[in-house]
Amino acid sequence: MIKMNIPVIFQFLKDLSANNNREWFNEHKAEYETARAEFDNFLATVIARISLFDETIRGIQPKDCTYRIYRDTRFSADKTPYKIHFGGYINAKGKKSDHCGYYVHLQPDGSMLAGGSLCLPSNILKAVRQSIYDNIEEFVAIVEDPEFKKYFPVIGEDFLKTAPKGFPKDFKYIDYLKCKEYVCFYNVPDDFFAQPDMLEQIDKVFRQFKRFADFINYTIDDFE
């Protein structure tokens, strides 16, 4: 197993959360750079593992997946200047693509392995819903498989209150069409990253997610 210093990442993020101001950050820039380098190392390892079963992401580098630590506070009541997590969005089409991708989020008491498509344009969202409706048996075989539900018991995070326009209200699986985004989240505790088989567990989670992503991306491929 490749050695990765995850505790260094968590310790910096804990300290940053308690001291989220520019003066403290500037005084601890070296610690930030060390923690960021450790996260990039971790992310590179995860990318390499995923690429063994998803060849589309081979060659992707951490810099292609990560985000600036500076928050955009222009339209937020929270004016703290820095994010208190590190995140990496692994997507063969790029971070801004509508395609489903894999997401790794490290945050003390808030880490997750996730993925999906957020903020889809209305025409693509409608097409995805239509694809689910037309191929519901295939979709249900994925998302209601016990192995999938072990990690992702819920599809989506924000939902319509009623059936989307153009679909029958009495459709048995209408809840799957009410999703405003097609995403999955698997929350993990901090000690998950200290387990000796951590990378093998990440493999299992993202192998299951890939089945969902492949279904959604089949439709999105027509638009990108």
Residue ranges and their predicted role:
Residues F171-E224:
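Charge-rich, low-complexity terminal tails
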Residues V8, A18-F53, K204-F223:
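Contiguous, amphipathic alpha-helical segments that mediate oligomerization or scaffolding
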